[in-house]
Curated annotation (Swiss-Prot):
Protein name: Uncharacterized protein C18B11.11
InterPro entries: Tuberin-type_domain (IPR018515), Tuberin/Ral-act_asu (IPR027107), Tuberin_N (IPR024584)
Source superkingdom: Eukaryota
GO biological process: negative regulation of TOR signaling
PANTHER family per UniProt: TUBERIN (PTHR10063:SF0)
Gene Ontology cellular-component annotations: cell division site; cytoplasm; cytosol; nucleus; TSC1-TSC2 complex
GO MF entries: GTPase activator activity
Amino acid sequence: MKALDIDTILTQISNQQSLDKRYKRIKRLINNEQFCKNVILQKLVDSTKDIIENKVHGNILAATISLWTHAAEKHKEMSSDDRALLFNELSKVPNSEYYPATVDALIVITSQGERTESFSNDILKVLSEWLTDLFTIIDDMRAQSRKSFKGSAELRNYTRCFRQIILLLTNMFRVGFNLFDEMEVSSMLANCVWVSKSTTDEEDIALVFSLLNCIISYGRISSAVLYSIVEVVCRAKFGLVASSQSAQQIVEKLLKTATKYEALNSLKRIMEETDEGSYIAIMGGIQIVSALFTDIPRSVYCTRGMLLGFLQRSLKNKSSRIALETTRSLYNALERRSFVEVLYADEWISLLDLLVEISSSLPKSLNYRPGTWQHIEPNIIESIASYQLQHLLLFNEILKPDSNHFVLEKFHEFLKINFSYLTPTLSQKLFTVLDLRSQLPYSEGWLEDQTILLKSYFDTSFSLDFHVYLIGLFRKVLFACPVELRPEVYARMLCPLVKSLDKSSSEVIIDEVISLVCDLSWIYPSNVFHEVKDSLCFYAHNSSNGDLQLRSIQAIVSLTFYYVLLPEFKSVLYDGLVEISCDFKIRRTFRIPVLKLLLQLRINTNDYCFVNLSPAQLELISVYSTQWHNPFISEEAQRCRDNKVKDRDLSFSPVFQKFPLKVNTSATLSKDLMSLPINEWVKNVMYIVTHETDWKVVQYILINFTNQLRNTKMFTKTVEALQLLLNSLRDIINGKQSLNINFSDFFRIEDLLVSLSKILSVLMVYKDVLPPTAHEQFFQLLNRFAEKGDKTMESCIDTLITNCCAMQSFSIMHLPKFFSITMSSNLSERSLVNFLRLLHVVSDNWELNEGLEKETIQSICLFCLKVIRTKKEELDGHKKLVNPNTKVFCLYLVSFSYSIISNLFLGCETTERAQLASFLLKEFLNLKNGSHFEGYERVFYELLLRYTYSDERIESYPSDSRFHFNSSSKSWLYRGCVITINAEYETGDYQMILRRMSGTTIYRFWRNMRDRGAFEKSLMMEQSMVSSELKQKYLQEIAASHVFMETVLSPLDSPDEEPILIKPDARTEELIQSLDATHTKPVINIAVALQAGDVSDINTTVGWQLFYRLLESFGHEKKLDNGETIYVWQSKTIEMIFRYVSDPAEALESSLYSSLIIIGSDDLVGPDSLNWDSVDVPVIIKISLDSHLDALKMFDTLFHVKLEIITTGTDISHQSFWKLDQIISTNSIAPLLHSYLADIGLYQMIFENFAYVHPWLLRQQYIDTLYTIHQVPTTQRESSALPSDKTFDFTLFL
């Protein structure tokens, strides 16, 4: 095309033409390649620029821009002036409607960047402005397009233009970044940031990020806009998945630029933002930081600890969303295992600290802080918990037992805090850790561990076995707890455990918790003990769960009796047991065993508390003990009980040195001593007796409470309780207090009265404690009981025997009535003996004797004479056959009655003695009725005659030296009872047993009267104690065991009675003196001789060897110091010594023998085989054996034996000829002789006792009288032949 043509065309499109013509012509020229290629751009612009300058709207403007664009495209080598000209005109486009066409033109203009250097900043500025304008338009159009489908083509056009601008900018920066001014670049970037924040279109953001990448790659971003760029990148990182990788790359590139530290600081600032509008950026930043955490940038100094610090700062926003993003991003990052191996310990700890803080957003976590997190939504919480659990599983797999200790500790803390969300595997891991940490109370977080255990225990989702396992952990923790933490830890752990028992139906759980309570008892803080005790008592009284009620009662019992606690705690427990024992709301099978234990409670004379393990009449309540198996017993107590250790002394073991079980028996209060609620106990016992319906239970209570009352140390200081007991007995016997006992075949009112009378009998022991007004009440009750029957009367008699002398004024006042009631009753044999003992005690006491009125004395004498008459008639009525035991018993009562009459006679006033003597002589002679006097009757007759008109007072005379008694004997006969002293020289204790026909009483003395120093030394050696403090404090307590396993054995012949424990003080000495136990029984010496013929006849008669075999059967062999051999046989009441004598006549002259036994063959032991004139013994026993036996081999076979027992005088008790003519075994002879000789010894003791209890007669006179009885003069021994009418024959069958 020619130049003329081009000019013509330019004229046609110039402003000289109308707009329509110009538009039509320009529109045709757009596609005219020749024109576009040859036209001069400056002329073209000059011809049409008025359209843009004048802002002519319409299609012509768009057509003009298109024409320019095509012409520029055809000019491949445009000069910079042409480019500048085009840009200057295009930049004047009036509005955004023409931006798409204009941008296409600008793309062509800037296709060669080096030719736009002069106006590149202008281009950047224009494009930046257009960018914001276009985005505003696009954003509005997008909002409208959501409401309708109109304008979609226009929107696409603008969107394409908008993205082309970004691409154009990207290309311009890539070609010549150095051409641009920093301020313009920053302005443009600010607009890009604004666009990125305002759009959600991923492609738009991708193009912007591409621009940012280009700028970062080819140039430098200003610090002014750096923060905004980092923020928008963080937003994109979180919000758009497609741009996430680009955002990460942008940050990584920024950390490699010159502004890397500013970029890092910008990232930090973003994490510290607190505005809610920044949450998206923060969460994106969390993702970026988490990604950097796995791959630390090397171009900048940035540690993992710093990055974790960024994450830590982000949590200050208190946003649960941020917490979720943090734990999620970290977990995604940690899935790359390779980098985990290179983490340092401090990095691990920082990481775990961060996760621990995130756990505070979980409501079930241990460190949960309500109100800390905002916008809490259930799904967010669940997601956080899920990711935390994933972290735990990951760490559990990564961390090994040999990992860093501090890291493992922090991991365990993280595990512990999230225990509510753990899987079974992690739970097992956690509790394994807690089990190991339970023994480390000083480690950090130890108290938090216990909170976990407690929460786990109360989580019902766990199994029963797991709960039992947790209780085992509680045991370890509580035992390991330091002293200073016990009040807090025990109150926080143990008390809730105990209080939760009422919600548990499992017997295993109840047993485990109660066992834990008992085992921990010795280290209880005060506040915990009282809280636990209150809970147990509440369950005992109010629980509807039978198992829990039983176990609670057993726990209180165990803590009281089988565990060591502070004395003040023990006192409280005793109070609780007393309340349980009388609470009738508690079922009987649970209540009775508690009552039984309390009845077994004792205090020894050193004030130590123990339990008598041998209660009387246990079979009465055995039915209530079937369910009572107490499993809560301390190991030491169990060991003692299993081994059945008697009197085991544990007082020197360390635990008892700290807490001795010593009872406060004084009126002052002391924290170091236990206090027993004696007053409440006595009150409750009487309450139970009056309200209990089962007679067997009441009977058991009365029997054992009587035994307990014998423990004087327990009740001596409780005057109020004793008075209450006395008043209760009075109300019951007088009918003021009714009983609820169900009448049955087993219940008789007499048995109840007897039991109550025994209580009254023991109460008399406390007569010195009670006020004098109670003494009269004693006698009034005794008279009331005596009126109720023979059984109660016997108990009353026994009571008066030991107490009437101590309360003389009241005895004188009330005894006459008691005597009258008793003597008018039909007394049994036991009661008769007992009553005679009482009369003897009264008659032997001067004050009581003188206080009796004449009528009373006469009635007593008549009663005794009636007894004498009855027993003499019984003896005479048997004619030939008389049982030796019956004979001895009758003679005992006769002699005793004479002694009582004698004492009463001697004790009366001298002015009344003549009248009384006349009365007694008359009655005595009427009694004899012409029969001959026995020896003792002659003594009594002479007594009456001698003192009828004399006022000589009775005096004591020394014992005659001719009476030699065995000093090692331990028995005395006193007032009709045998007193036996059993000494335990190893322990320094001894007991005195009073055996009488009506029963047995035992007094136990807890110290020996021998050298204390030697005893203490021996005790110290036995105990091997070296502590000086222990020696000073405890070695003075010389006693049997003071702990709970001490046993007091009841006497075998009186199983219902226990010893009365007495301390050997002044009162003990008075008791011994009042018993008058000073006369020992003589040992019965028996001579044994062999009657043999000539030596040549030794083989045809009984040989010496056979004789010694028979002698050995009499008793055990014993060698004396002088070389003599004797044979000793002992029983409970007698001791016999058999001595071989070669010459009976000579032996009997030098010593006093009770009997002579002659053994020989039947041909040698005959009526004339012995010179009777030389025999000075009361009894001769002849044993003759068959003369045809001569070998030892025949000793144990049956053969013919003749046995003769011959009395040498007129001894009425044995005035008989015993003859045994029978085939028996020779070894049966010994028991036969033992029985017979024991009767002889008992008979002798009666007479010698009768002599002793009358000290007003000269001893020599009684010796003469004794020999007179046996018809043996002291100066000349005369032979006495047995009168035939006084000989009785009978045969004894073995």
